[in-house]
């Protein structure tokens, strides 16, 4: 969901322009009270940074934060610059030859803010409430790369890029095909890596742990003591292990079948709908097991170990 964070100060100015047609005031910076009498109060920004927004105003600039960690920023810059160029052209065309230029600028700014204010959102962009609110506002919710790629070759996009001499229709179609192929290859590599990790490391390790638990149950019972805790844990781990093995087998099957889909667009959709979905099914019990399997048996450092201890390397 694409939204824009303006912050309290700029949002207040925009709302004044929409409601009154003029901005006569703005929210000013406050003081950060440290609570310590020996330290001075500090100036603080009139707004925060909102790290959940994909497109945020941060005091003196806008930040576009949606570029993937492994992607080049060049394609995003090309698209953003082309969009800005089109907007400037439309504005220039509307202002060309007007008698009262200042009033025309004023009215146009008010109209643009009013027409497009639905994209402004200053709240938590990760919340379910925002998903519902975005739907109410009529904003698109594009959930995967495969869903986003067709936007490159829509008649509207082709007209935009061709009118500014950026891309031809053939160039856009070729880029779309390349993106489909890159997506399919990336998910294929991740799926095979997941199969290797689950089959050669996690499942054998959990089997060893369940064996240890089973022996513990027998030993405690032979001693005449209550082994219900060990038995309950054994049942829980065995249940997750069963789910994981089923998803593991399914992932091997659906990944192998992907090679039979020859059309690159359909193959990308197959990886999204079948392979990625099965990967999520495999991860779910693995995440549960990571929380309850003895550290000595788990084959990888846990998130907690990586974040909070210095012996993560020793666990590899």
Cite the ranges covered by each PLM segment.
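Flexible loop/turn segments at secondary-structure boundaries
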Residues: 63, 70-74, 204-205, 210-212, ...
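Conserved small/polar residues in nucleotide/adenosyl-binding loops
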Residues: 308-316
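Charged, amphipathic alpha-helical oligomerization/scaffolding segments
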Residues: 83-86, 90, 197, 201-208, ...
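Extended alpha-helical coiled-coil "stalk/arm" regions that scaffold and mediate dimerization/assembly
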Residues: 180-214, 218-221, 229, 261-264, ...
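Long, low-complexity or tandemly repetitive, helically biased scaffold regions used
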Residues: 250-263, 310
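Active-site capping/gating regions of soluble enzymes
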Residues: 1-178
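Generic long, charged, amphipathic alpha-helical segments
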Residues: 216-242, 246-247
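Long amphipathic alpha-helical coiled-coil segments
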Residues: 259-271, 293-307
């Amino acid at each position: 969901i694409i939204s824009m964070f303006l912050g309290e100060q700029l949002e207040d100015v925009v709302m004044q322009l929409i409601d009154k047609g003029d901005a006569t005031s703005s929210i000013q910076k406050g003081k950060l009270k440290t609570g310590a009498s020996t330290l001075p109060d500090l100036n603080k920004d009139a707004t925060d940074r909102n790290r959940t927004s994909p497109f945020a105003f941060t005091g003196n600039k806008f930040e576009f934060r949606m570029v993937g960690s492994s992607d080049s920023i060049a394609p995003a810059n090309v698209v953003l610059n082309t969009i800005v160029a089109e907007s400037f052209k439309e504005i220039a065309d509307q202002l060309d030859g007007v008698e009262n230029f200042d009033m025309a600028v004023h009215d146009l700014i008010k109209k643009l803010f009013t027409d497009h204010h639905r994209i402004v959102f200053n709240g938590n962009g990760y919340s379910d409430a925002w998903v519902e609110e975005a739907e109410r506002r009529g904003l698109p919710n594009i959930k995967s790369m495969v869903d986003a790629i067709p936007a490159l070759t829509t008649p509207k996009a082709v007209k935009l890029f061709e009118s500014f001499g950026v891309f031809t229709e053939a160039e856009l179609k070729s880029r779309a095909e390349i993106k489909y192929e890159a997506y399919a290859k990336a998910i294929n590599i991740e799926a095979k890596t997941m199969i290797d990790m689950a089959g050669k490391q996690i499942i054998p390790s959990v089997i060893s742990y369940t064996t240890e638990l089973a022996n513990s149950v027998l030993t405690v019972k032979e001693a005449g003591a209550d082994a219900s805790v060990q038995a309950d844990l054994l049942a829980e781990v065995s249940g997750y292990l069963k789910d994981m093995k089923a998803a593991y087998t399914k992932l091997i099957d659906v990944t192998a079948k992907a090679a039979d889909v020859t059309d690159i667009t359909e193959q990308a959709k197959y990886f999204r709908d079948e392979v990625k979905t099965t990967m999520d099914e495999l991860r779910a019990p693995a995440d549960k097991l990571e929380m309850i399997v003895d550290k000595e048996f788990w084959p990888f450092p846990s998130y907690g170990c990586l974040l909070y201890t210095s012996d993560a390397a020793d666990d590899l």
